[in-house]
A protein has these predicted regions:
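FKBP-type peptidyl-prolyl cis-trans isomerases
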Residues: 1-255
């Protein structure tokens, strides 16, 4: 009898998927699909995505659907708002004085940052800006058409896959005595993005590979190599940051 491997919590798997809302494709791992649907991005990583099952990289309903599926499985899952990006909360809609936005004039659809919250400008009336801090997909049912491509068993391959996924580059790495040793170009120290990525990457390695320590070793080659970093998947860049010194009068936006 042939043994068929099924997905369980803690597994490192690669998946391909297309994400849809109301029949419209909003994300895809296939470059050709993304291009055809007009959602291609130079900053996106295309090809099968690494998922550590149970790590919370996917919405709850999607991740739960993976459990028990065989490697090679293809199918669809429809995820209700409660198990996706949540229901829309009217209390998360606020009115912000327009003078809080110093760098760029707010317009409907703009993503903005206000006091460590990210929201979407929905309306600008006079000197007041309506900002919705709900997730853009809150209240929406999401459909995922996906395929489980492979399971990664080897520890070193898992480490390299985590590095590629979170650092968006391939770095030399090895595992010695329960310690992950990662060689990094010294130029990376100039990038604030890397300072944030390295902490999150180390946490993932220790938690999901069961290693005791992560050592980053600077590599000096004598060549001036400019390392290009991009935002990790799911990160929402702030189009405009509202200044905290000028406070709102507490008025709430209409639902």
């Amino acid at each position: 009898m042939e043994f068929k491997m099924t997905v369980k919590n803690g597994d490192f798997i690669r998946i391909e998927y297309t994400e849809m809302v109301d029949g419209q494709v909003i994300a895809a791992t296939d470059k050709d699909v993304a291009t055809e649907k007009g959602i291609f991005s130079e900053e996106a990583q295309y090809g099968p995505h690494l998922i550590v099952v149970g790590a919370g990289q996917l919405v709850k309903g999607y991740e739960e659907d993976l459990i028990g599926k065989e490697i090679g499985y293809s199918g669809k899952v429809e995820v209700a708002p409660e198990d996706a990006f949540g229901l829309r909360d009217p209390k998360k809609a606020e009115i912000i004085p327009i003078n809080r936005f110093k760098e760029k004039k707010p317009v409907p659809g703009m993503r903005v940052g206000v006091e460590n919250k990210v929201g979407t400008v929905t309306r600008v009336i006079g000197r007041k800006v309506n900002v919705d801090f709900n997730h853009p997909l809150a209240g929406r049912t999401i459909v995922y058409d996906y395929k489980i491509v492979e399971n990664i068993d080897d520890q070193l391959e898992k480490l390299k896959a985590l590095i590629k996924t979170f650092a968006h580059m391939e770095l030399e790495a090895e595992i010695k005595d329960d310690v992950a040793i990662i060689n990094v170009l010294w130029e990376l120290s100039y990038y604030k993005e890397w300072l944030m990525i390295r902490r999150g990457l180390a946490d993932m390695i220790i938690q999901h590979l069961g290693l005791k320590e992560v050592d980053y070793v600077e590599k000096h080659t004598g060549e001036k190599t400019r390392a290009e970093l991009i935002s990790p998947p799911g990160k929402e860049p702030l189009a405009e940051e509202a200044k905290p010194e000028e406070q709102n009068d507490g008025e709430a936006a209409p639902a």
